């Protein structure tokens, strides 16, 4: 059966595998706002938080990114990346407008590698962009936490994310 999330109550199908806690986190190449490639996933010397959002130009994604920027401000030993399909130029403008400095904002426009995380929307008005989700990857490169937000227009559970990150760092 196809995996779905809802857009204003209507189901949309997701493309790619369903990652579960304990799975190896695939490496994915994204492009930062400064046009540099960054690899997310896999084993690293820090805990990784990979946040996928549909577009920074929407109110919920804007709020979510600003909130994670604020929440992660004092955390050491964690690398946070917010990934959308927005072009890096728009992401740079967004980061400058809202003083986003504590998370990396990156785009999946070049390789569509986030399909490896099963969050690419495969149909409907949002086909080709990313669903709202949060993945926490431990230092060994294993998925430690997954939150696929069931309704695209809603924010994730921030407290769950923070608690899991604190547990791992």
Swiss-Prot record:
Keyword RNA-binding appears in the UniProt entry? no
Q: Where is the Thioredoxin domain?
A: 19-167
From the record, give the cysteines joined by S-S bonds. Answer: 61-95
Q: What else is known?
A: The active site is a conserved redox-active cysteine residue, the peroxidatic cysteine (C(P)), which makes the nucleophilic attack on the peroxide substrate. The peroxide oxidizes the C(P)-SH to cysteine sulfenic acid (C(P)-SOH), which then reacts with another cysteine residue, the resolving cysteine (C(R)), to form a disulfide bridge. The disulfide is subsequently reduced by an appropriate electron donor to complete the catalytic cycle. In this atypical 2-Cys peroxiredoxin, C(R) is present in the same subunit to form an intramolecular disulfide.
Name the HAMAP family on file: Tpx (MF_00269)
The text of the family note is:
Belongs to the peroxiredoxin family. Tpx subfamily.
Q: Which UniProt keywords apply?
A: Antioxidant, Disulfide bond, Oxidoreductase, Peroxidase, Redox-active center
Q: Which Enzyme Commission numbers does its entry carry?
A: 1.11.1.24
Q: Which SUPFAM superfamilies match?
A: Thioredoxin-like
Which species expresses this protein natively? Aquifex aeolicus (strain VF5)
What reaction gets catalysed by this protein? a hydroperoxide + [thioredoxin]-dithiol = an alcohol + [thioredoxin]-disulfide + H2O
Active site per the UniProt annotation: 61 (cysteine sulfenic acid (-soh) intermediate)
Q: How does it assemble?
A: Homodimer.
Q: What is this protein called?
A: Thiol peroxidase
Keyword Oxidoreductase belongs to the record: yes
Free-text function comment from the UniProt entry: Thiol-specific peroxidase that catalyzes the reduction of hydrogen peroxide and organic hydroperoxides to water and alcohols, respectively. Plays a role in cell protection against oxidative stress by detoxifying peroxides.
User: Pfam families, per this entry?
Assistant: Redoxin
GO function terms (MF aspect): thioredoxin peroxidase activity
Q: Which InterPro entries does UniProt cross-reference here?
A: Redoxin, Thioredoxin-like_sf, Thioredoxin_domain, TPX, Tpx_CS, Tpx_Peroxidase_subfamily
């Amino acid at each position: 059966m196809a995996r779905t999330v809802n857009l204003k109550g209507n189901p949309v199908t997701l493309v790619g595998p369903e990652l579960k806690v304990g799975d190896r986190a695939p490496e994915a190449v994204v492009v930062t706002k400064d046009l540099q490639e960054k690899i997310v996933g896999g084993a690293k010397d820090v805990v990784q938080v990979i946040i996928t959002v549909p577009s920074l130009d929407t109110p919920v994604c804007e709020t979510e990114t600003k909130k994670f920027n604020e929440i992660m401000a004092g955390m050491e030993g964690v690398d946070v990346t917010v990934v959308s399909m927005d072009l890096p130029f728009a992401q740079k403008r967004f980061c400058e407008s809202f003083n986003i400095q504590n998370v990396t904002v990156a785009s999946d426009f070049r390789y569509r590698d986030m399909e490896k995380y099963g969050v690419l929307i495969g149909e409907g008005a949002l086909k080709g962009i990313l669903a709202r989700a949060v993945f926490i990857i431990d230092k060994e490169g294993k998925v430690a936490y997954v939150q696929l937000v069931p309704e695209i227009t809603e924010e994730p559970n921030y407290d769950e994310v923070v608690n899991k990150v604190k547990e791992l760092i």
